[in-house]
Structures are given as structure tokens and as C-alpha cells.
């Protein structure tokens, strides 16, 4: 180690002495003598780039730092990350090392590779002194690192309060708090407030708000309220709402904070947050007084008496748009309901800051053209600052100053409209536009939400003009509080300026604002307030001047303040707002409240003067606790001249409406009072002109798309339209107009829409059948207001609310999914439904002529009945991401479990699965226009023919029919897959996958992998001879058999649905390949039983290497997936009419037993490829028994070389024999020291035995003529060949000498094909080179053996025949197989005798079957042991 390295090590170890010794200069004389004048390199850097000074700074050792700096160490040397000693000193956070390094001249603003300057590190770690020192050395706190964060951002993110205070007190504070350009679109854009809110640092949020940060500052994810709500920070949400954040702001995904909480959080905290946000954004809550259901209107809200409806906005025709939240399911239903339906029960989120907005109170004079209809009005309280803002910030709806009050909610705009709709006929000649309509500048009363729901606005209690004196009022407050033992709060009330009359209008939030913070106390006081019966104390007449008015309300002390600030005129005072009171110094909450109540009263009096000539009685709201009032219009008087001016209109906060809004609301009146047009939904009434002509009009441009109204009436002539209204206001029927393209809807709340048909009486556009529908690009274009709306209707549900894409394409009427919320949701489905509608491809059938769907706002997803025209019964459209089908895990319910009606169709809205795997159903036929989405489509199971699959050109062909049934070619055009009408359900096939349905390759793969883990299909049982396979008469065949086996569990689902804790593999009846080889090219292949029975998950193999490419009949075309290379080529020349009679057995899947061994050769099923894990093993299904009866028993075992089997003599089938399902008898046991356990008969036609040489392992015993099922090519060392087949589990008697040391070697011996072997190499040496060569078969294994071998596949690489997993494994297996040997020997002997006797009787067959069943059970246990050992 050189001196430099020694120095670095010494400094690292803080060895000052060694460092000094290394750094001291050698004496000149000594240096000359030694010839070493070379000085040590003090800047030497180790492999990480650390110099000695880096280590010293990081350790904070001032002595070493001084020593190194004296030795001329470079002070700004960088390590591999660009960090300098100053960075490490700042990170470490000690003042003295920092001073030394700064004194040495280190630069404070040079960033590291990550963009950090030392101030970033000091701020992030909360080192106050170091941060202060860096600021004093002119460190720039506005520098951002690579992730766009300033030191203030980091301090806020990590909760470093002291550093935040320090940075905010610096002269760069304003620059630090300014929003950076591009924050709203930059995915990394953030702000100190967002970071503090996200991490729940309340103290820092307070500091930031005090420093003047914009509370409504937005990034891509929304405001700080979005961040706090998403992260479940309840206290932060409360603080932000109290501080006046706008709860209606939408992020770039068009979500409010409440939307985010509804979608993404389920914790207890989120419930509180939901309530807080609901209160902050609630427009009005109404309790329904009666049931309401209009099944003919898609947009109506079905209401039951007692439902609490949150009112969102008003439709131009007078109906209210409301939302009912279902606390049980967490869903919202949104729709329209008549305004007369209920009574208002506003649980008002009152002024937490002690202030409330001056919301308009409607008067009785809302216009001659309006019918006497109740309009329930919300008066939204103010909670300080920008507490509740309209979604789009109404122009002119804000007060002055940094804390300008937004229009309270959506209800604000609708009320501003309703209450300000005055036609010219309403206005007298003396009206001045400078005076607001009565009530629009008033103050919302603040009663708590209790009793007196029935009182209406018109009841007038007696009044007392003079308020009590200050002393008396204080005493009265104390006595009142003492009465219910809460006198400790008397100072709070008195210091805030509250007297009893003002207390009678307090809300719980007002109580919080004055310091009543305990919920129990607050509730008690609120209850007592509701019991106060204080007569109305506000002046009944408009006094002559301001002084008189102030003395009448007991606030004469503010006369000078008001006059000094320009409110000397009594008429000016009606324009005052909460912000103005704060600004001019009226800060006592009680006085503010009293003053604003009196201002509202004064505005009402002024409005009453305007309305005198109308003759309508002035109704005034009595002091009750509930916000209940009905705005009733008097009968219309004689129309007044059209040139009368309308009074000036204001919003809820008493600020004037914008010019456009004024114009929009008063403009239609110029047309004259006689232009009346009946409303679409109501009989013609005199109100039509104002209610419709002065429809939302100009205010629409200030409305975001979440508030789209279903405008049915004609818009005002000069009303500028916002996008939302252009789509939502249509001008009556226009039968010839083609439907315009639907624009992408912005999805608002996650809601559940009641499914109701359209309103009959409404003039709707009829879509002619030939109307052009949307075409694939479907570029949403901005449409004109006049064109009819083809958005959703009886033939197409509106799209579900997808929160993922800001502007998903709307589906055409026939293709739109139903709302995800409409499906009963299992626990695995309960996540948010992500639906990403893609552009529709292909043709869309013309909609049935009839009333066009009413315009549906995209914030109101609807469920509609399926179109009858474009979907055949039982062919529900399915969506699939890649047109595959996955195995459903056992936790994912099928359609029956979802209880979705079979007619729920074209398809139910798909949901992003919460379960372990996506269960993707293959799309139904003709799905050129399927909207792909990452989804799982629920499939109705019990109706109609199966869904035709998609056309895929590359699919391998397989037959889905039994040999004795003709191939139905009725649906060739439906895709590659003519699914049979008698396909089984999953419960019938017990977890088998329907190869006759599209995408089954994926399912096969999933199933095969399941078999290696413990899932799997159930065995097949044979019915009595001659009976075709019983199939459940499922009227809905397309719903066949997803794999019910759990991906991770060991249980398989039995036929009855019970969990069978036994492994089952995919073996099933297998047929002889010999017949295949002997068949001529002209004979067509018959489907193997695997296809229909569902137990064989493999695709039939295509033509093998040496075979003629002769195709069979039209086979069920299995849809290939690009993701699976596990395609099985069909054996081309398979025979046709072989009957495979399959049943399901609980223990072993065995080959069909033939009554006569002499039966002709049987056609083999398609070659099976078993995929377990990565190893791919192609297994040839064992022969049913192919071979003439005359064949002698096999000779003693010889050991021929492992050659290709082409040289074996072909055995022609006897021509005259009928082809019956032959039972392959168990072949005679070879002469061996230890017999091989055999399960079922093996092909015995050939006398030649071909041993299978395994690389590095003894040859495995092989059946006579059985081809080596594995390519003899040794597996590549890195890949573990998956042993799929244990010889112990070979269902055929294997004979052949084996050098295996003991039978224990044989059971685990696996005929595994290495993963590297391409599919075409299936069993390459065993493959007959030509159709004439006899193909020999590896018999299928019993399920347990397969499972065991599959489980063994997880073991480390082993030779294909399955090297023993260990001595213990061998020992166990020896014991077990020894036990089985004798039984097997007896069975083989008996079978050999029976074979010689010719046809066996059924009794013999049964006895043999039961014996084999028992042996199968033993093998199950053996497989269990092997499995346990291998795992």
C-alpha cells in the first residue's frame, strides 16, 4: 500500500498521528540522503473517488480537516457522485467542519451529479446551523436538484420545521413560494405545500400558509388537498379545508380530492376524509319525502323516501341534479329528480374561520314565468380563505384580495342562475342595475342541522328591533351557558362578540372557530342553540341612513370604520363581503356574523321594494334551525314592457356576476314576455320563458365538464356555450340530422347509475338505421350545440367512469360497457374498475330506430339494456387484452358466482382484477369491434350457443368433437373455433379447460403449470360401454371451464365444486399412435378425447417431421396466442370413428378399457405437450391398444440400441375388425430383478423394446415398442429439465432391461424433454418418419405421478430420466415400489391370461378396473411422498 492509500486509510480511521507523520515534510538533508524528495499526493482518491478530505469532512474531524487543508488538499475535489467535501460536511451537519471547509473557499452552489448543493443536504437532514451558515455564504435556496426540488421542498417533505422557518425568513422566501412554470403539467412538478401535505407535516403547512403560499397551487396530481386525501392525512385535510382550499379543483385526470378518496382509499381515515370533503363540497342536502322512480328517463334518479340527496346543480327544465351516496357499498348514484321531491336538511359545514359567504336567499319574486315550484336552496358556509370554490372559478364570482372567496360550489352557480332569472316583465322601470336582486347579497343563516324541517321561508315571527345592550347580552350568554353547565365557554362567546340573537344562528363550525373544539361540548351547544327561540331581531324596514341601521343591530361602534372605508351610504353596505369586513378591521366573529345577517336582511328589503309592484307576498325565512326554504313564484302578473332593466345580479358572495353571466341571464328577456315554450318534461306552463330561455347560458363557460347539465330545453339565443353545454343542450328534435360524434367525456365521480329507459314524452332524435356510426379512428370533434346528441341510450350504456385516461373515447351506443359498479362485486372485484375504452374497430350494427338515447353526461354512467339487434343470444361480447384466456384462480368467481344476469349483455363492464390473476375470457366471434381493455369480462353461462372466437390465421387445428359426432361446420365464419353446443361447464369438467374456446392455449399453459403446483383437472371416468360421454345440457356452452384450480393452492376443485386435496394431472384416455402410423394419408384424423372432454389441455400437434401434410376434417380451431409457443401439431392421419367413452374418476385417470383386446387399432389423440414450469415435455398419449390379437407375448427383454423407430415393422390393422375402444391390457412384466409398477395396459404389438438412454443415467425401462418420449439430446446444463413423467407412473407395462440399481430409480425417472428442445422435436427419435411407420406411444401417466413429476420439475437440473433426489428419496421410493411390486405382478399375470382368452366379460373388466384404481391410489401416495421429498 502506497503512502497515499495509507493516508486515506489513516484519515478514514481518524488516526491523526499517522496522518501527521505521512503529511510532514521530510528534512532536506535526509531527503537528499534517501533520494526521496517526492511529496505525498494529498489529493489521492480511492476507487469511490473519495479523497482524504472527503473522509475527514464526513467524519467531522476538524483536526484532520485542518491538517489536510494545510497540506494544500483540494477543497472542491469531487468523488464519483460529484460530491465535494462541503457536501459531506453539510450532510454530516456539524458547524466546525463546515466553517473550516467554507473558510478554505469551498463553493456553496456547485451541485453534485444529482443536482444537490450542500444546502439541499443540510435542509433535508434538518441541520439548522449548517443551513444558516450556507445561506450566510450566499447559497442559493432556489436551486433545484435533478428531481426539481429546492432545499425548501426537501425540508418540507422531511418535516424539518426549523429549516423551513429559516428558509421562509430568508430574502428568497417569495421566490421559493412562487409556482414554477410547467408545474401543472410536469410529472415531477411539486410544491412545498404538496410535499408537506403528502407527508402530514401540519406545522409546516401552517408556516407555508402564513408565508403566503398559494393554497390552491396545482401540480399534475392536483392541489395539496388531493395529496393529503390520497395519503390519508386526515388532519392535513382538515387544516387545508379550514384554511380555505378549494375542494372542487380537479387534477389533470379530472378528479377532485373526493373522487380520489372514493377510488383509492378504504381506510378508516379515508372515511373521515370523505366526510370532510363531502361537507366542503356539498352543495345542498335534501331528504326525499316520497319515493320517486321514472323508468322512462335514463337520467332520472331513483329515490326512496328518506334518501339523502346531495344537490349538485339544476337542469334548465327545473329539475335538480343530485347524488345519492350509498354508505354500504361506497357508490354514488347521480341523476335528476323533481325539485319538489324533498326538504332541505343542510348539514352545513359552517364557518370554521367564523365567517360565512353571503349566499343569496331566493325571494318570492323569482319571475312571473316561473310556476309556483319549490326550489331548495343551499347556503354554503365559508370556512376561511378560498374554502370552497366553484370548479372553474366563476368570473366575477370572487371577492378581492389573496383570500378571495370562490363561488361556493356547484350549487352556487345554479342558485345564482335560478334566483337571478328575471325577465323584463319582472323588472319595474325604476329598477337600478346597481342593486342586486333581493337575497342575492344576503347572508346565509347559520342554524345547526336540527329540527324544524317543515318551516318554510314565509313564516314571520315577531321582531325586536333593539338589541340588548352589551352588558346585558354578555350576562344573557353566560346564563344560557350555565343552564347546561358549559359556562366555561362564556369568555369564548363574549370575546368573539356573540350575543344570544347571533348565537341562535351559529353552526357547529362557528363553535369550533371560537374555540369549542371538544365534539361532545360542541354537539351539546349546537343542540341548545337549536332550542333557542329568539325572535327575529333584524330591522323590518330599510332605515334612512347607515348610522340608524347600525344602531338598530347594535353595532354602532363600527359606523366610523365603515364610513372611512367608503360604506357611508346605506345602499353601499349591501355590497359588503366577508373579505371586506376582514380588510376594514371588523374581526370579531360574532360581529361579522351579525353584520352579514343584517346585510342579507337589508338586501331582502331592497328586493322587496323592487317586487312591490308585482303584488306577490314577500316571504321571509323564519329563524329555524334547518336550512329549509321554498322559493315560490307568485302567479305571473301582467307582462311589463320589454325594455325594463333587470336588477344587477350577484353571486352568493355578493360580488357581481360577470358581464357575460349577466347578459346570459337577462339576455333572453329581451325577446319579450310572450315567447313561451313548454318545457320538455313538464306540461306547458307560463314559466317556460324564463326557466328555459334564460337557461344556464353564459355561466356555462365557467362551468367545468364535471357539471354538464342535460340541457333539453333550447339554450338562450345569445348564450355562449361551454363545451359541456354544447354537447348537452340540443334544440328539440331534428330527425334528419345524423348523430354527431361523441366527444370524450370527462369522468367525474365514481358513480353508480340506476338503469332506466328514456323519457317517453321527450322529443328525441330518431337515429335512422343507416346513420353512420363511429369509425375506428373516432377522433372526437367538437360538435355544434344544435346537432342532436348520440351519446348513450336504450341501446348503449354510457361508459363507466374511467379515471385513468383523461379523455377516453366514448363507445358507440351498441358497444358501450355497463358501469362497473353495476356488477355485484366479490371481494376480489372490489377495487376500482379501470376501464380504458379504446377506439371502436369494425362495423357497428345500426341502432334500432326509435328514440335516440337522451344525452347522458359522462359524469353519469348509466346501465342500459343490451341491444337486441347486434348481439346474437348467448354470444355476449367479451373483451380481452390479448384475446387470451387465463386460468381463473379459485378466488375469482365465475359468472354464476357473480350473479350477473345472462342477459347483461353485450358485455358487462370489465374490471381491473384485484385477484391473483386476470381471468380474461376469449372474445366472442366477429369481435372485430371488441374494445380491448385490460379487463375481465363476466360471461353469462347458461344461455345460447357459444361465442364464436376471433379469426386468427396462425392457429393450429384441433377437433372439438367426439368421434361419433359430426363436426358442426355451422359456424365456420365465426372465427377459427366452432365451439360445440354441448361444451361442459367448469364444474362438470372439474377444472378442465375448454380447448374449444378461444385463448385456451393460455388456459392450457396455466392449467399445466397448475398441475405442477397442485391444481389440475379431475380424472375422467368411463361410462358404460356404448354410451356416449354424458354432458351436462348446459344451454350456455360457451362458458366452459376456466381452470378452477387455484394457482397457488394444493387443492383441486372436484366435479361438485368441493375442494379435493389430491393432486390431479392432465392425463386422460389416450389412444395409440400405432394406428396413426398405419393409417393411410386419406384417412382423416379424429379428435382425441382430450378435446371434448376438456381433460386434455393440449393442442393437437400439426404434421410431424416425416408425415404427409394431410389435414383432417374442419377441426375446432384453437386460438393461438402469440405469447405461447406451446402449440401441438395435430396428427394428421388419425382415424375418424373411434368412440371414446370418458368418465370422471376420483383417483386415477386411466385409459378407456376395451372389452376386446382384439379390437382394431385405435386412433391416438393429439400428441400432448405438458408444460410444467420451464421444461417442455411432449408426451404421446398411450395407445388405446393398437395391435392385432395374434401378437405373442413379448419375448424376454433384449437391449437393442436406442435407434429411431423407423425400422420397426409396420403392423397393418386387420381390415375386417370393427374399431371399438380397446382397453390396453397390462403387458406381461419383463424378467427383472424388481418389477416395474404398471398401471394400465400398454401397447404390446411390437416385439422390439427401445430403451431410452438418458444422459448420464441408467436407461429407463420402456414399454414394448414405446418410443423414447424424449429427444435423446441431453438437456442443456443450465436448464433444469422438467421431469414430467415418472416411470413408476407409466400407465403401460414397461418392459426392458434396466441397469437401474433398484426399482427406486424408476419411479422418479422422468421422461423429460429439456426446455431447450423445440416443439417440433417432440419425441424426436420416437417419431415415425413417415405415415406408414408405426408410431409408438408413451402411455399417459396417472395423475399423481404426473403431479409428482411436475413438482419435481422445480428441482435443480437432473437428467431426463430423473436422477434420484437424494438417498432418503431413493429409500422411500424403494420401500413403496417394493410394496407395489407384488400387486402389480399379480395384476399383470391376470391380465395376460385374460388377454389370451380373448374378449373379457364386463365383470372381469370391472374387477381389473377396481384393482387398477387401488393401484392408482397407491401411486397417489407414492407421488405425495416424492412430492414432499422434492419440495
Swiss-Prot record:
Basic and acidic residues: bias regions: 1390-1404
Biased composition (Pro residues): 848-858, 1026-1035, 1189-1215, 1266-1281
Polar residues bias locations: 772-786
Domain SH3: 281-347
Region named Disordered: 348-373, 387-406, 421-447, 630-977, 1014-1039, 1072-1377, 1390-1416
Domain SAM: 472-535, 541-605
Residue ranges with Low complexity bias: 357-368, 798-808, 952-963, 1282-1297, 1343-1355
Residues annotated with Phosphothreonine modification: 737, 1065, 1266
SUPFAM superfamilies, per the entry: Ankyrin repeat, SAM/Pointed domain, SH3-domain
SMART domains: ANK, SAM, SH3
Residues the record lists as Omega-N-methylarginine modifications: 398
ANK repeat start-end pairs: 48-77, 81-110, 114-143, 147-176, 188-217, 220-249
Keyword Mitochondrion included in the entry's annotation: no
PROSITE patterns (alphabetical): ANK_REP_REGION, ANK_REPEAT, SAM_DOMAIN, SH3
Primary residence: cytoplasm
Keywords: ANK repeat, Cytoplasm, Methylation, Phosphoprotein, Repeat, SH3 domain
Keyword Manganese assigned: no
Molecular function terms, GO-annotated: identical protein binding
Residues the record lists as Phosphoserine modifications: 358, 423, 432, 633, 646, 719, 724, 787, 889, 891, 987, 1067, 1257, 1364
Localization in the cell: Cytoplasm
GO biological processes: regulation of postsynaptic density assembly; signal transduction
Location of region: CASK-binding: 375-469
Record GO cellular component, one term: postsynapse
Biological role: May link the scaffolding protein CASK to downstream intracellular effectors.
Known partners and oligomeric status: Binds the CaM kinase domain of CASK. Forms a ternary complex with CASK and LIN7A, LIN7B or LIN7C. Competes with APBA1 that forms a similar complex with CASK and LIN7 proteins. The tripartite complex CASKIN1/CASK/LIN7(A/B/C) binds the cytoplasmic tail of NRXN1. Polymerizes, via the tandem SAM domains, to form long, 8 nM wide fibers, upon which other proteins can assemble.
Name of protein: Caskin-1
Encoding gene (name): CASKIN1
Amino acid at each position: 500500500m502506497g503512502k497515499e492509500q495509507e493516508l486515506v486509510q489513516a484519515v478514514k480511521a481518524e488516526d491523526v498521528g499517522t496522518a501527521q507523520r505521512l503529511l510532514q515534510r521530510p528534512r532536506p538533508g535526509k531527503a537528499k540522503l534517501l533520494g526521496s524528495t517526492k511529496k505525498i499526493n494529498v489529493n489521492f482518491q480511492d476507487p469511490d473517488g473519495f479523497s482524504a478530505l472527503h473522509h475527514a469532512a464526513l467524519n467531522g474531524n476538524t483536526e484532520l480537516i485542518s491538517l489536510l487543508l494545510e497540506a494544500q488538499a483540494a477543497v472542491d475535489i469531487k468523488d464519483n457522485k460529484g460530491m465535494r467535501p462541503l457536501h459531506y460536511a453539510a450532510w454530516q451537519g456539524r458547524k466546525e467542519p463546515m466553517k473550516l471547509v467554507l473558510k478554505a473557499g469551498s463553493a456553496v452552489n456547485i451541485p453534485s451529479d444529482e443536482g444537490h448543493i450542500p444546502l439541499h443536504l443540510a435542509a433535508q437532514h434538518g441541520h439548522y446551523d449548517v443551513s444558516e451558515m450556507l445561506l450566510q455564504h450566499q447559497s442559493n435556496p432556489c436551486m433545484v436538484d435533478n428531481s426539481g426540488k429546492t432545499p425548501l421542498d426537501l425540508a418540507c417533505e422531511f418535516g424539518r420545521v426549523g429549516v423551513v422557518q429559516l428558509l421562509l425568513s430568508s430574502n428568497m422566501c417569495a421566490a421559493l413560494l412562487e409556482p414554477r412554470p410547467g408545474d401543472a403539467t410536469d410529472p415531477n412538478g411539486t410544491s412545498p405545500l404538496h410535499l408537506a401535505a403528502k407527508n402530514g407535516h401540519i406545522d409546516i403547512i401552517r408556516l407555508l400558509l402564513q408565508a403566503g403560499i398559494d393554497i390552491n397551487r396545482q401540480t399534475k396530481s392536483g392541489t395539496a388537498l388531493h395529496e393529503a386525501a390520497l395519503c390519508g392525512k386526515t388532519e392535513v385535510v382538515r387544516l387545508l379545508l379550514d384554511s380555505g382550499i378549494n375542494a372542487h379543483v380537479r387534477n389533470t385526470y379530472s378528479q377532485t380530492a373526493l373522487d380520489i378518496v372514493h377510488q383509492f382509499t378504504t381506510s378508516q381515515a379515508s372515511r373521515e376524509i370523505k366526510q370532510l370533503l363531502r361537507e366542503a363540497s356539498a352543495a345542498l342536502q335534501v331528504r326525499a319525502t316520497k319515493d320517486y322512480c321514472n323508468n322512462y328517463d335514463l337520467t332520472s334518479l331513483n329515490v326512496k323516501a328518506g334518501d339523502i340527496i346531495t344537490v349538485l346543480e339544476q337542469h334548465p327544465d327545473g329539475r335538480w341534479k343530485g347524488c345519492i351516496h350509498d354508505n354500504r357499498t361506497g357508490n354514488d348514484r347521480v341523476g335528476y329528480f323533481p325539485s319538489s321531491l324533498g326538504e332541505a336538511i343542510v348539514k352545513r359545514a359552517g364557518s370554521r374561520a367564523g365567517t360565512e359567504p353571503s349566499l343569496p336567499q331566493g325571494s318570492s319574486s323569482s319571475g312571473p314565468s316561473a310556476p309556483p315550484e319549490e326550489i331548495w336552496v343551499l347556503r354554503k358556509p365559508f370556512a376561511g380563505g378560498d374554502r370552497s370554490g366553484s370548479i372553474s372559478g366563476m368570473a366575477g364570482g370572487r371577492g378581492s384580495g389573496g383570500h378571495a372567496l370562490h363561488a361556493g360550489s356547484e350549487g352556487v352557480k345554479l342558485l345564482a342562475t335560478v334566483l337571478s332569472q328575471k325577465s323584463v316583465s319582472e323588472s319595474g322601470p325604476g329598477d337600478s342595475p346597481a342593486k342586486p336582486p333581493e337575497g342575492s347579497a344576503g347572508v346565509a343563516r347559520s342554524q345547526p342541522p336540527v329540527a324544524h324541517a317543515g318551516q318554510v321561508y314565509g313564516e314571520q315571527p315577531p321582531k325586536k328591533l333593539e338589541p340588548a345592550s352589551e352588558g346585558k347580552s354578555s350576562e344573557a350568554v353566560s346564563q344560557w351557558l350555565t343552564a347546561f353547565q358549559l359556562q366555561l365557554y362564556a369568555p369564548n362567546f363574549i370575546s368573539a362578540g356573540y350575543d344570544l340573537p347571533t348565537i341562535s344562528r351559529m353552526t357547529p363550525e362557528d363553535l369550533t372557530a371560537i374555540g369549542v373544539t371538544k365534539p361532545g361540548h360542541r354537539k351539546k351547544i349546537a343542540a341548545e342553540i337549536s332550542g333557542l327561540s329568539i325572535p327575529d331581531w333584524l330591522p323590518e324596514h330599510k332605515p334612512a341612513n347607515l348610522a340608524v341601521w347600525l344602531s338598530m343591530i347594535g353595532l354602532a361602534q363600527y359606523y366610523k370604520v365603515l364610513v372611512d372605508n367608503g360604506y357611508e351610504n346605506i345602499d353601499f353596505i349591501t355590497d359588503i363581503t366577508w373579505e371586506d369586513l376582514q380588510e376594514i378591521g371588523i374581526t370579531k366573529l360574532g360581529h361579522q356574523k351579525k353584520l352579514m345577517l343584517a346585510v342579507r336582511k337589508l338586501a331582502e328589503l331592497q328586493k322587496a321594494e323592487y317586487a312591490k309592484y308585482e303584488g306577490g307576498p314577500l316571504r321571509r325565512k323564519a329563524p329555524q334551525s334547518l336550512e329549509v326554504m321554498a322559493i315560490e313564484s307568485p302567479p305571473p302578473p301582467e307582462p311589463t314592457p320589454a325594455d325594463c332593466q333587470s336588477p344587477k345580479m350577484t353571486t352568493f358572495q355578493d360580488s357581481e356576476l360577470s358581464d357575460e353571466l349577466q347578459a346570459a341571464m337577462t339576455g333572453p328577456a329581451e325577446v319579450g314576455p310572450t315567447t313561451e315554450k313548454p318545457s320538455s318534461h313538464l306540461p306547458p306552463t307560463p314559466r317556460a320563458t324564463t326557466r328555459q330561455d334564460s337557461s344556464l347560458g353564459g355561466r356555462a363557460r365557467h362551468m367545468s365538464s364535471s357539471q354538464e347539465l342535460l340541457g333539453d330545453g333550447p339554450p338562450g339565443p345569445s348564450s355562449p356555450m361551454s363545451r359541456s353545454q354544447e354537447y348537452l343542450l340540443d334544440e328539440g328534435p331534428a330527425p334528419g340530422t345524423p348523430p354527431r360524434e361523441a366527444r370524450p367525456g370527462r369522468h367525474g365521480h365514481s358513480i353508480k347509475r340506476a338503469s332506466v329507459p328514456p323519457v317517453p314524452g321527450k322529443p328525441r332524435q330518431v337515429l335512422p338505421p343507416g346513420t353512420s356510426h363511429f369509425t375506428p379512428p373516432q377522433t372526437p370533434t367538437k360538435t355544434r350545440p344544435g346537432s342532436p346528441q348520440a351519446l348513450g341510450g336504450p341501446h348503449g350504456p354510457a361508459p363507466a367512469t374511467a379515471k385513468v385516461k383523461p379523455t377516453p373515447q366514448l363507445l358507440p351506443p351498441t358497444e358501450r360497457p355497463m358501469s362497473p359498479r353495476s356488477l355485484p362485486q366479490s371481494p376480489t372485484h372490489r377495487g376500482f374498475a379501470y376501464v380504458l375504452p379504446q377506439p371502436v374497430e369494425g362495423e357497428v350494427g345500426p341502432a334500432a330506430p326509435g328514440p335516440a338515447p337522451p344525452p347522458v353526461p359522462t359524469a353519469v354512467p348509466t346501465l342500459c339494456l343490451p341491444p337486441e339487434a347486434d348481439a346474437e343470444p348467448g354470444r355476449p361480447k367479451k373483451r380481452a387484452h390479448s384475446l387470451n384466456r387465463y386460468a381463473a384462480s379459485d378466488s375469482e368467481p365465475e359468472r354464476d358466482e357473480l350473479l350477473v344476469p345472462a342477459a347483461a349483455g353485450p358485455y358487462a363492464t370489465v374490471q381491473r382484477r384485484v385477484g391473483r390473476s386476470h381471468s380474461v375470457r376469449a372474445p366472442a366471434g366477429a369481435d372485430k369491434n371488441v374494445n380491448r381493455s385490460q379487463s375481465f369480462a363476466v360471461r353469462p353461462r347458461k344461455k345460447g350457443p357459444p361465442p364464436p372466437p376471433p379469426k386468427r390465421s396462425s392457429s393450429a387445428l384441433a377437433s372439438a368433437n367426439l368421434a361419433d359426432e359430426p363436426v358442426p361446420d355451422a359456424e365456420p365464419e365465426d372465427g377459427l373455433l366452432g365451439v360445440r353446443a354441448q361444451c361442459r361447464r367448469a364444474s362438470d369438467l372439474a377444472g378442465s379447460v375448454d380447448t374449444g374456446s378461444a385463448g385456451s392455449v393460455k388456459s392450457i399453459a396455466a392449467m399445466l403449470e397448475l398441475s405442477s403446483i397442485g391444481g389440475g383437472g379431475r380424472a375422467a371416468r368411463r361410462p358404460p360401454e356404448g354410451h356416449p360421454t354424458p354432458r351436462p345440457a348446459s344451454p350456455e356452452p360457451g362458458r366452459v371451464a376456466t381452470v378452477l384450480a387455484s394457482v397457488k393452492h394444493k387443492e383441486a376443485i372436484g366435479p361438485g365444486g368441493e375442494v379435493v386435496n389430491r393432486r390431479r394431472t392432465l392425463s386422460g384416455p389416450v389412444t395409440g399412435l400405432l394406428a396413426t402410423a398405419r393409417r393411410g394419408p386419406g384417412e382423416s384424423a379424429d379428435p382425441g378425447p382430450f378435446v371434448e372432454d376438456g381433460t386434455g389441455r393440449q393442442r393437437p400437434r400439426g404434421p410431424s417431421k416425416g408425415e404427409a401434410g394431410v389435414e383432417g376434417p374442419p377441426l375446432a380451431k384453437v386460438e393461438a396466442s402469440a405469447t405461447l409457443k406451446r402449440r401441438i401439431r395435430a396428427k394428421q392421419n388419425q382415424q375418424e370413428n373411434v368412440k371414446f367413452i370418458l368418465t370422471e374418476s376420483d383417483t386415477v385417470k386411466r385409459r378407456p378399457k376395451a372389452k376386446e383386446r382384439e379390437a382394431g387399432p385405435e386412433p391416438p389423440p393429439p400428441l400432448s405437450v405438458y408444460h410444467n414450469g420451464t421444461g417442455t415435455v411432449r408426451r404421446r398419449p398411450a395407445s388405446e391398444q393398437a395391435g392385432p390379437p395374434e401378437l405373442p407375448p413379448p419375448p424376454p427383454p433384449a437391449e437393442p440400441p436406442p435407434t429411431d423407430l423407423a425400422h420397426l415393422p409396420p403392423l397393418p390393422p386387420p381390415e375386417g375388425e370393427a374399431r371399438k375402444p380397446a382397453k390396453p391390457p397390462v403387458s406381461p412384466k419383463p424378467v427383472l430383478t424388481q418389477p416395474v409398477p404398471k398401471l394400465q395396459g400398454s401397447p404390446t404389438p411390437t416385439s422390439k423394446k427401445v430403451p431410452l438412454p438418458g444422459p448420464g443415467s441408467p436407461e429407463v425401462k420402456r414399454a414394448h415398442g414405446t418410443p423414447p418420449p424424449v429427444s435423446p439430446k441431453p438437456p442443456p446444463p443450465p436448464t433444469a429439465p422438467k421431469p414430467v413423467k415418472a416411470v413408476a407412473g407409466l400407465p403401460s407395462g414397461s418392459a426392458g432391461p434396466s441397469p437401474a440399481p433398484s426399482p427406486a430409480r424408476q419411479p422418479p425417472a422422468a421422461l423429460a424433454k429439456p426446455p431447450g428442445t423445440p416443439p417440433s422435436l417432440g419425441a424426436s427419435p420416437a417419431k415415425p418418419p413417415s405415415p406408414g411407420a408405426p408410431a409408438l406411444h408413451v402411455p399417459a401417466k396417472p395423475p399423481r405421478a404426473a403431479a409428482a413429476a411436475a413438482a419435481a420439475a422445480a428441482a435443480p437440473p437432473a437428467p431426463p430420466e430423473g436422477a434420484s433426489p437424494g438417498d432418503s428419496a431413493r429409500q422411500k421410493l424403494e420401500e413403496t415400489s417394493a410394496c407395489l411390486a407384488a400387486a402389480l405382478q399379480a395384476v399383470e399375470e391376470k391380465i395376460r391370461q385374460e388377454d389370451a382368452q380373448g374378449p373379457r366379460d364386463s365383470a372381469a373388466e370391472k374387477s381389473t378396473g377396481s384393482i387398477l384404481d387401488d393401484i392408482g391410489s397407491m401411486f397417489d401416495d407414492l407421488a405425495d411422498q416424492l412430492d414432499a421429498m422434492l419440495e
